[in-house]
Structures are given as C-alpha cells and as structure tokens.
C-alpha cells in the first residue's frame, strides 16, 4: 500500500527522507516555513544543500501546513529539537492525530527535559500514543540521499502503526528494523550527540584512534546507564539506536557534533564554532538537558558532565581532559 505523506521540515535530513519516501513510490508533500526555500525546491527541483540530487515528480512542496496535510495517511517530522514544539503545536491546531506521526529528529527539549516523543504526547494527549512512531539509527543524510546501504530502527507503541511505518520506509538499501522500546530508541539518538562532541575534541587534539574508541565505549556505557535508569531496555542501546548511531556520529566526517568538538579543541568558543558550522548542533543543547536529568537522578556520567562544563561553565578543555584521565579505574561495567 502506498501512502500520502506530509513531511514537516525540509532541512538536509528532512529532504533526504522525503526523497527516499518518494523514490519508494509514495506521494510526498514537503513542508517548510521558508517560502524562498519552497519556491526554490518547487521551481528549480533542487535542494540548496544537495544540488546534485534530482527531485522525483511525486515529491511536491508547500509553505502552508494545511496543504501538506490534505489527504495525508502519514505525517513525518524532521525539524530540529528546538522547533519540535512550535511545529507540533501548529499541527495540533490543524488536525487531530488519526494517522501515524513519525518522529525522525534526535534531541531532548531544553528546560523541560522532555524527549521529542514526550512533547508529542503532551501536545496531542496520551491517546495519541497509538499513532506515534520514532525512527532513529546511524543515518547520515548525504549517504541516504546517495542511496548507500543504511540500517535504522523504527519504534511504535501500537503494532499496527509499527507495521505501517515499517512498510513505508523499507527499501532494498534502507533497512528498517522494528524495536518496541520507543523511549530507548529516542534516548540513544539524543545522547550520542554529546559523546560525539567529546570525540571531536579528541580528534582536534590528535589523540588518535585508541582514545576515540575509549570515548565511544565509555560513552556508550554512560548512555546505557542513563537509559536503563529511565526505564529503557539496555539491549536497545547496544543496537542501531545506540551503538550504531554513536559510531556513525563519532567517526563520520559529516557529523556536525564531531566537527563542533574539533573546532573547540582548535580554540574556538562554542558560539564561534556554532557560527562556523552554520547549522544546528543538537549535542550542545542535549548536553545541558542530559546533565540536568543526570544530576537530578544522581547518574554518574563523566564524559557528558565534562562536555557540559566546557560548554556552560567555561571549563578549560585541557583541564576537563585531565580530570577524566585522573578518575579512578573501577570495575568496567560498574
């Protein structure tokens, strides 16, 4: 069964998945607030961040959300974590949620500490959980656009919703694995960005592969510990939504979070690094939320804490590294 899909958010990530869904035979209407971007996509049939990609005819665009929703059998969101609440609030004013809503963004809301799925439930109400889905995993947008093999996970509370979303996204090269632990899937995608910043700092100081692999492994331990205390399944974080996504984000040359960390090591301030990258670096905001939650629940997360202190307490990076290296080495999995 082919879907009519409203895709909310036409940044590089949103465009890559909208393009994938259209190439999979679905009718897709992409929405963005920016009329100039919509005009360029509609007239030139090229995305400014990926001008080499031809846009299929069954992918159209609008800056009017009600037009995107017309006849939609599925809604997919691909906006930043900061944009999630205003976009879903606008969506709520236009429709009651009676079709699957697939969240593909990764992050934790500032101030509230809510996962993006929890924002959706707060806005639409608990009964909307039956329509909610979450897609996450190692998926660099530029590689998805090129049709490179990719494996992700999809989670949903309702088995029928899970099947519908799974069918819509699955292609010969975009492998979609079901996972019933929606909160674990969401947390893995959010927290890995903080560890990736630490890996970028390691790259900037040229500490080498041994140090980076240590950060990834110990970082995964922090993520798994955090998620388990939050009620998630530990094995979820050992899979694509945790380890897989963490590896891709930490080692990819296309990772904003890793590049951000590298720029910090080269002497740029956080604001200067964000300006140079020119796009949202989700790990900056997740570091604050994760630190606040970890402090409240007394979860020991030394790498996350160090990144937070560098970003928000002006901790000298060299001092932060020294503090990590001077920690006691206790039993590995404690």
From Swiss-Prot:
The residues that hold NADPH are 13, 33, 106, 141, 256, 280, 282
Which InterPro entries would you find in this protein's record?
Answer: 6-PGluconate_DH-like_C_sf (IPR008927), 6PGD_dom2 (IPR013328), G3P_DH_NAD-dep (IPR006168), G3P_DH_NAD-dep_C (IPR006109), G3P_DH_NAD-dep_N (IPR011128), NAD(P)-bd_dom_sf (IPR036291)
Its function, per the record, reads: Catalyzes the reduction of the glycolytic intermediate dihydroxyacetone phosphate (DHAP) to sn-glycerol 3-phosphate (G3P), the key precursor for phospholipid synthesis.
**What broad class describes the main subcellular location of this protein?**
cytoplasm
Q: Which UniProt keywords apply?
A: Cytoplasm, Lipid biosynthesis, Lipid metabolism, NAD, NADP, Nucleotide-binding, Oxidoreductase, Phospholipid biosynthesis, Phospholipid metabolism
Please report a single Pfam family linked to this protein: NAD_Gly3P_dh_C
Which reaction is recorded as catalysed by this protein? sn-glycerol 3-phosphate + NAD(+) = dihydroxyacetone phosphate + NADH + H(+); sn-glycerol 3-phosphate + NADP(+) = dihydroxyacetone phosphate + NADPH + H(+)
List, alphabetically, the Gene3D superfamilies matched: N-(1-d-carboxylethyl)-l-norvaline Dehydrogenase, domain 2, NAD(P)-binding Rossmann-like Domain
Q: Name one GO molecular function term.
A: NAD binding
Q: GO biological process annotations for this chain's record? A: carbohydrate metabolic process; glycerol-3-phosphate biosynthetic process; glycerol-3-phosphate catabolic process; glycerol-3-phosphate metabolic process; glycerophospholipid metabolic process; phospholipid biosynthetic process
Q: What is its EC number?
A: 1.1.1.94
Tell me what this protein is called. Answer: Glycerol-3-phosphate dehydrogenase [NAD(P)+]
Class of the enzyme per the UniProt entry, highest EC level: oxidoreductase
State the compartments where it is located. Answer: Cytoplasm
Q: Which GO terms describe its cellular component?
A: cytosol
Where is sn-glycerol 3-phosphate annotated to bind? 106, 137, 139, 192, 245, 255-257
């Amino acid at each position: 069964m082919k879907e009519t899909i409203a895709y909310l958010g036409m940044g590089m990530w949103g465009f890559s998945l909208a393009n994938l869904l259209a190439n999979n035979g679905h009718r897709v209407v992409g929405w963005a607030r920016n009329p100039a971007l919509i005009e360029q996509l509609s007239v030139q049939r090229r995305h400014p961040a990926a001008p080499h990609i031809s846009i299929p005819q069954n992918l159209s665009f609008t800056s009017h959300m009600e037009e995107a929703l017309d006849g939609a059998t599925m809604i997919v969101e691909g906006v930043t974590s900061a944009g999630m609440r205003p976009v879903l609030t606008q969506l709520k004013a236009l429709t009651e949620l009676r079709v699957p809503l697939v969240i593909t963004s990764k992050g934790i809301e500032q101030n509230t500490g809510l996962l993006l799925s929890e924002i959706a439930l707060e806005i639409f109400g608990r009964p909307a959980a039956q329509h909610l889905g979450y897609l996450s995993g190692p998926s660099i947008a530029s590689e998805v656009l090129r049709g490179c093999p990719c494996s992700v996970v999809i989670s949903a509370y309702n088995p029928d919703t899970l099947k519908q979303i799974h069918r819509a996204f699955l292609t010969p090269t975009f492998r979609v694995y079901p996972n019933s632990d929606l909160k674990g899937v969401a947390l893995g995608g959010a927290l890995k960005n903080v560890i990736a910043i630490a890996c970028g700092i390691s790259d900037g100081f040229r500490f080498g592969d041994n140090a980076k692999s240590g950060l990834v492994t110990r970082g995964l331990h922090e993520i798994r510990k955090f998620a388990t205390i939050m009620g998630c399944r530990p094995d979820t974080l050992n899979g694509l939504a945790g380890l897989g996504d963490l590896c891709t984000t930490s080692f990819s040359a296309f990772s904003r979070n890793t590049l951000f960390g590298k720029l910090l090591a080269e002497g740029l301030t956080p604001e200067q690094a964000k300006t140079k990258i020119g796009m949202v670096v989700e790990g900056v905001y997740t570091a604050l939320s994760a630190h606040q939650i970890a402090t409240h629940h007394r979860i020991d997360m030394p790498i996350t804490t160090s990144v937070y202190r560098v970003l928000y307490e002006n901790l000298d990076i060299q001092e932060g590294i020294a503090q990590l290296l001077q920690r006691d080495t206790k039993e590995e999995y404690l």
